[in-house]
Amino acid sequence: GQIVAAGDLQALASLGENPPAGARVRALAVAGAFHTSFMQPAVEPLRNLAATLSTHPVSINVISNKDGEVVSDGAEVLTRIVNQIANPVRWDLCMETMKSLGVTGVIELPPAGTLVGLLKRAASEIEGFALRSADDLPAAREFAERHL
């Protein structure tokens, strides 16, 4: 499995210098501390914006990154998206849900590659497609048609 640590740079450097036994620590190329408590100040403004939006019943089930649960209510999907920015992504639970639902293919949107790589290792029975640019759209369409 993979665990992502977030914190101030000095604390993360210390973790890198003294990793837990058997662990490998490396810095991730990210634009921000998304899905961590460092994003908490953004939750309320996003919640206020979300309150101005209308939701509708979803036409397909959504698997929540919070806990891998299937969500079918549009308002709940929006609430979970707002809260997700300051909470960990549980991709492991999402993959378990996809396996239990019989999902056969997943398209990862840009920037793509990380989740498909994890999928390949943890749920090899599910085929992954990393959509990296507009040039990949025809192949992504063919991929989707094979998995409908």
Predicted segments — roles?
Residues G1-L148:
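Acyl-group transfer acyltransferase/transacylase scaffold of fatty acid/polyketide systems
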